[in-house]
Amino acid sequence: PNRQQQVSREQLAEIEAKHIAHELAFSDAVSGKFVATYCNYKKDIWALGPRLRPNRRGGASEQDNEERIKQRFAMSEKILNIRQKYYKEYSKFLTQTQIEKVYEQERMLMKRHAKRGKKMATPK
């Protein structure tokens, strides 16, 4: 892809937030709060560092595998804590139904990004 077409992850988070706000027909005031909160949420997630991937190569010792599993548990716990923190933030200006729909939209976007990533990874 053209370098000018590449979007920073901060810009992508803002685009995602605006898309979700538009899809859920938030008012301008709520949209502004949502976009800012969603972008902060994404920054907190990114601050955790890269996701730990399972060892697909094999050959790792039992101890290595145990350590990797424990690291993934720790990462999952940190992500859960961040999600709970932002759930409380969203609850200040969104209804519970709206929050549920935000999570649904977020899952749909993640699936779409995963599909795009696979398409780009496959040789033509």
Regions found by a protein language model. Give the residues of each.
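Metal-dependent catalytic neighborhoods of phosphoester/phosphodiester hydrolases
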Residues: S8
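Amphipathic, charged alpha-helical segments and their helix-to-coil junctions
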Residues: L80, Q84-K124
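Bacterial Sec-dependent N-terminal signal peptides
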Residues: P1-Q5
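Amphipathic alpha-helical segments
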Residues: E16-F93
